[in-house]
């Protein structure tokens, strides 16, 4: 399986997601992206472990390590993502940071943002882009395993009303329990 490494650190650096040719065995090469065979070389951006590497796949639905391209066995291009509570916490932090920015001014927003690591800030900015791309690609996401990297408090979040070709955010992400979110915000 070949993946595409997103070398940019902001949304414009992830333009590869918007330019991927999703036909099997074909891929467009665009600025900011390069093909890399797994395992990834040491020192790739965001690589604290293989699961945390920031990647985009040919279908644009694998931004976190742990996803698996299943095209060889099913004939379809979809991924089995392995999201962690940490990513969901980052998304929650972004929402709180934006709210506090409006309510408390720039200083309040900056204080909230400072509690995120650079990796978490990056994840919080791309979580909505991943949802958008998976929806556009019509990617059908298989069930997410109950156990995730942090070992507890996570559950698959599925939206029964959503169809495989129109995925809602709830059907894509593994959400944290209320206790973990409260802990993350404390």
From Swiss-Prot:
Region (Disordered): 147-166
Keyword Nucleus: yes
Localization, UniProt: Nucleus; Chromosome
Keyword check for Phosphoprotein: yes
Cellular-component GO terms for this entry: chromosome; nucleus
Post-translational modification, as annotated: Phosphorylated in an ATR-dependent manner; phosphorylation is required for interaction with H2AX and RAD18 and for DDUP-mediated DNA damage repair.
Top-level taxon of the source organism: Eukaryota
Induction details: By DNA damage.
GO terms classed as biological process: postreplication repair; recombinational repair
Substitution effect: residue 174 to D: Does not affect interaction with H2AX or RAD18
Keywords: Chromosome, DNA damage, DNA repair, Nucleus, Phosphoprotein
Subunit note: Interacts with DNA damage response proteins ATR, H2AX, PCNA, RAD18 and RAD51C. Forms a complex with H2AX and RAD18 following DDUP phosphorylation.
Additional information: Treatment of cells with ATR inhibitor Berzosertib abolishes the interaction of DDUP with H2AX, RAD18 and RAD51C and inhibits formation of DDUP foci, leading to hypersensitivity of cancer cells to DNA-damaging chemotherapeutics.
General function of this protein: Promotes DNA damage repair through both homologous recombination repair (HRR) and post-replication repair (PRR) mechanisms. Enhances the retention of DNA damage response protein RAD18 at sites of DNA damage. This allows for HRR via association of RAD18 with RAD51C and for PRR via RAD18-mediated promotion of PCNA monoubiquitination.
Protein's recorded name: DNA damage up-regulated protein
Organism of provenance: Homo sapiens (Human)
Gene this chain is encoded by: CTBP1-DT
């Amino acid at each position: 399986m070949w993946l595409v490494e997103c070398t940019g650190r902001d949304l414009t650096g992830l333009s590869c997601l918007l330019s991927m040719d999703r036909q099997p065995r074909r891929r467009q090469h665009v600025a900011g992206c390069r093909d890399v065979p797994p395992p990834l070389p040491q020192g790739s951006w965001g690589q604290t472990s293989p699961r945390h590497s920031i990647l985009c796949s040919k279908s644009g639905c694998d931004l976190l390590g742990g996803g698996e391209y299943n095209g060889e066995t099913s004939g379809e291009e979809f991924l089995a993502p392995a999201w962690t509570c940490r990513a969901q916490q980052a998304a929650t932090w972004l929402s709180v940071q934006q709210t506090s920015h409006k309510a408390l001014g720039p200083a309040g927003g900056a204080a909230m943002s400072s509690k995120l690591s650079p990796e978490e800030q990056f994840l919080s900015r791309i979580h909505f882009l991943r949802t958008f791309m998976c929806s556009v690609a019509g990617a059908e996401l298989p069930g997410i395993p109950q156990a995730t990297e942090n070992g507890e408090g996570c559950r698959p979040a599925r939206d029964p009303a959503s169809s495989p070709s129109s995925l809602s955010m709830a059907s894509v992400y593994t959400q944290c329990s209320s206790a973990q979110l409260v802990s993350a915000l404390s």
